[in-house]
């Protein structure tokens, strides 16, 4: 029986967490951390490239299971998944916006300066406070389906179907 936790996997997990933490701390654009922050942000983009896309696809299935508009989630994902400065951020944001029939994003103040950003999703209905609970349910179902998906992949590695 294969041991699940190997030392190289643990090292990769620590490396990933370090990259993610660096991006959170200094990955934004300002004069003080411009180059160091840019390096952290690019490393984070590379580390999350595949996981962001897998999560977006799993979230579309999750939208179906929590009775949201999975079809619109798919359409919005296909159209708006690159509508963000980060190559990964809009992957799940576009699915959530489409599944909830709302529009997200747009301009905002960032460190006291107005920053223009494109919107994600369609302005079909106004955003409501209850959308937070609905989005949390979408998040939980996405996590459950991801766990099932990767457990099945792991089991197929242990017990290959020939």
Predicted regions and their residues:
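Hydrophobic alpha-helical transmembrane segments
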Residues: 1-22, 27-162
